[in-house]
From Swiss-Prot:
It is a multi-pass membrane protein. Keywords: Cell membrane, G-protein coupled receptor, Glycoprotein, Lipoprotein, Membrane, Palmitate, Receptor, Transducer, Transmembrane, Transmembrane helix. It comes from Mus musculus. The lineage of its organism: Eukaryota, Metazoa, Chordata, Craniata, Vertebrata. A lipid is attached at residue 325 (S-palmitoyl cysteine). It is found in: Cell membrane. PANTHER family: G-PROTEIN COUPLED RECEPTOR. Residues 78-87, 142-163, 230-254, 312-386 are cytoplasmic. One of its GO terms (biological process) is adenylate cyclase-activating G protein-coupled receptor signaling pathway. Specifically expressed in fetal and adult lymphoid and hematopoietic tissue. Expressed in lung, spleen, thymus and lymph node but absent in other non-lymphatic tissue. Coexpressed with GNA15 at the same relative levels in all tissues examined, with the highest levels in adult spleen and lung. InterPro entries: EDG6_rcpt (IPR004064), GPCR_Rhodpsn (IPR000276), GPCR_Rhodpsn_7TM (IPR017452), S1P_rcpt (IPR004061). SUPFAM superfamilies: Family A G protein-coupled receptor-like. The gene is S1pr4. Glycans are attached at residues 2, 32. This is Sphingosine 1-phosphate receptor 4. Receptor for the lysosphingolipid sphingosine 1-phosphate (S1P). S1P is a bioactive lysophospholipid that elicits diverse physiological effect on most types of cells and tissues. May be involved in cell migration processes that are specific for lymphocytes.
Length: 386
């Protein structure tokens, strides 16, 4: 008896028994009902991934390595403990976990999907949802703190630090709740009419809820940066000095980069999920062929975030260069003078004494490289935070 014939003979009572026992046949049943099983084209194709499995894992590993490098560089070589420092660490950590969750999701996809218990399936998908949510919540928190820094009166460092810690903890708590909601009961197990075609055990109501949450986050981020830009532009018009106008242009470029990155990376995924929610199963199956690319594009946003939020800061650039320099020294790939000279030359335009690295003769002593706090950590913040 094939899967299609067997699934038609399954009664609601037997389906609930499969769910209670945590049997993997429940996943097969849901995939067959959604049409995902018929569209996989056999088990030898890797469950729709096929030749994309290798590049997908490689892309996820690159996201992990990129964010791990930035995370280590900021944590080791930057002495600043202002609020932006914690925001950058939070964004980088969430993007690193997004890359890890994506790699785990790809490795457990394909034929391995039907070897998972329902709980493991919910954890596989929920971990990726949680990581993506943490990344977007972190971007929203950073935008909110930038705006609050500009409009609030000066406050004590202890008060600001406590609020930053609390908001970071809230970001991760909300992300964990959002990712675990299906495991906690918001799912469509044995309720096939309410099931998503793209994520066969997820309720369409939950998918719609996630789309609305992510869309509201995007609108809030763009609104906050738009307000920040208006404040900076107004200050620049009051001040005829060229640095103020350059700061306004730099902020505008950053806001445009954030907008383009969000629309390009998240727009296709939003469209796919909306088609799944409001379209028919046949319509959803037509878009299903591009699901792997669309999900990879959303994860790619975690590779772009360091370029927007971290590498645009000269202080972070110096930290990353110092981290790479010490790695070269440890591997013996180039002499300390050559390595450190390149870093010094990269920032020699600021000041002859602005070099934040001191040449050392060994890898051990190179770890004590120090940075001068000559400029704000964030290139798009108009005032120093206390």
């Amino acid at each position: 008896m094939n899967i299609s014939t067997w699934s038609t003979l399954v009664t609601p009572e037997s389906c609930h028994r499969l769910a209670a026992s945590g049997h993997s046949l429940l996943i097969v049943l849901h995939y067959n009902h959604s049409g995902r099983l018929a569209s996989r084209g056999g088990s030898e194709d890797g469950g729709g991934l096929g030749m994309l499995r290798g590049p997908s894992v490689a892309a996820g590993c690159l996201v992990v390595l990129e964010n791990a490098m930035v995370l280590a560089a900021i944590a080791i070589y930057m002495r600043s403990r202002r609020w932006v420092y914690y925001c950058l660490l939070n964004i980088t950590l969430s993007d690193l976990l997004t890359g890890l969750a994506y790699v785990v999701n790809v490795l457990l996809s394909g034929t391995r999907t039907f070897q998972l218990s329902p709980v493991h399936w919910f954890l596989r998908e929920g971990l990726l949802f949680m990581a993506l949510a943490a990344s977007t919540f972190s971007l929203l928190f950073t935008a909110g703190e930038r705006f609050a820094t500009m409009v609030r009166v000066a406050e004590s460092g202890a008060t600001k630090t406590s609020r930053v810690y609390g908001c970071i903890g809230l970001c991760w708590l909300l992300a964990a709740i959002l990712g675990l909601l299906p495991l906690l009961g918001w799912n469509c197990v044995c309720a096939f009419p309410r099931c998503s075609s793209l994520l066969p055990l997820y309720s369409k109501g939950y998918v719609l809820f996630c789309v609305v949450v992510f869309a509201l986050i995007l609108v809030a981020i763009l609104s906050l940066y738009g307000a920040i830009f208006r404040v900076v532009r107004a200050n620049g018009q009051k001040s005829p000095r060229p640095p103020a106008r350059r700061k306004s242009r730099r902020l505008l470029n950053t806001v445009l980069m954030i907008l383009v990155a969000f629309v390009v990376c998240w727009g296709p995924l939003f469209g796919l999920l909306l088609a799944d929610i409001f379209g028919s199963n046949v319509w959803a199956q037509e878009y299903l062929r591009g699901m792997d690319w669309i999900l990879a594009l959303a994860v790619f946003n975690s590779a772009i975030n360091p370029l927007i939020y971290s590498f645009r800061s000269r202080e972070v650039q110096r930290a990353v260069l110092a981290f790479l320099c010490c790695g070269c020294l440890w591997l013996g790939l180039r002499g300390p003078g050559d390595c450190l000279t390149r870093i010094t030359e990269a920032h020699s335009g600021a000041s002859t004494t602005d070099s934040s690295l001191r040449p050392r003769d060994s890898f051990r002593t190179s770890r004590s490289l120090s940075f001068r706090m000559r400029e704000p950590l964030s290139s798009i913040s108009s005032v120093r935070s206390t």
